[in-house]
Amino acid sequence: MLDVRRLRLLRELARRGTIAAVAEALAYSPSAVSQQLGVLEREAGLPLLERTGRGVRLTPAAQNLVRHAEAVLERLERADAELAEARTGLAGALRIGAFPTATRAIVPAALADLARRHPGLEPMLSETDPAAVAHALRAGELDVALVHSYDFVPDPEEPGLTTRPLYREAMYLAAPAAGPGSTWSAEKAGPAPTPDAPPGQDEALRAHRDAPWITATPGTLCHAMTVRACQAAGFSPRVRHRVDEFATVLALVAAGLGVAVVPQLGTPGPDVPGVALTRLRMERRTRIAFRSGAGAHPAVAAFAASLRSALPPGLAGRGAGA
């Protein structure tokens, strides 16, 4: 009988490529990973790994075994969810990951609702960048998380994980309002938009092609979104400041130090002192992520329900099409 824990190691090796990466991700020593994979090889009765210089490569038999391992591990997640549902009451830890704007604007109310409905649950929140969620879920560091994607930044394929839509939000071009010391004023963006009729996105962005831009740090989805949106409008942004916190981004914009693209939840409201907000046609889509098979787990389902009940009025009901 093949050992499930060793199958998990083989699956991680298929994803990460090296024994060292598997060891680091799962907090094992490389020698322990090699030893357990050797035992799995004996259990299988076939070679699973081929040496390639300093690394290893999966044999065709191992690749086939990984496909079966994916199905087995998903079924185990479902079994765990059904067992949890059969127990009376929800209790125990629920490890939650969320990105900063959701952590500020939505998660506190959701956790308060969850505590009222299920006092036996112990939610544990970690602020987590969406780019790190897949690893944290697979490693068992999180049970459920919020991730987001933007126009121009497609969702990556994440085998073994499932996502469900939560909400969409509008995106805005933030520019300094007209006034003393404002070099890049709102006047360049044209007439003020209405919620139902935003201006042409390319025109709004091109109006500030010569402005200094404020983006998130490279490697983040927010950075890629801004750069690709500008490129689609026909120019590359001249990035001067790299800041991840949207409150700081808006403070820099208000000081006349540049322009930026920000999501709806990244603003305190439609009126930001010193900042002109121009709605764009692009959106940010937020989804609930969990390991495949775990969606029916009562704790995960309860948190998802609390999230939906906590959505601000401007976002409520928008998840179905996200």
Description of each model-found segment:
Residues 7, 43-44, 65-87:
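Alpha-helical linker/hinge and terminal dimerization helices associated
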Residues 12-29:
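Short helix-boundary/capping micro-motifs
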Residues 41-58:
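A short LG(V/I)-centered, amphipathic sequence patch enriched
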Residues 91-154, 158, 243:
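Central regulatory/effector-binding core of bacterial HTH transcription factors
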Residues 129-134, 138-142, 148, 215-273:
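Hydrophobic hinge/microswitch elements
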Residues 148, 181-187, 193-233, 296-305, ...:
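Secondary-structure junction motif
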Residues 155-165, 169, 247-295:
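Beta-alpha-beta core module
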Residues 274-322:
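A late-sequence structural motif
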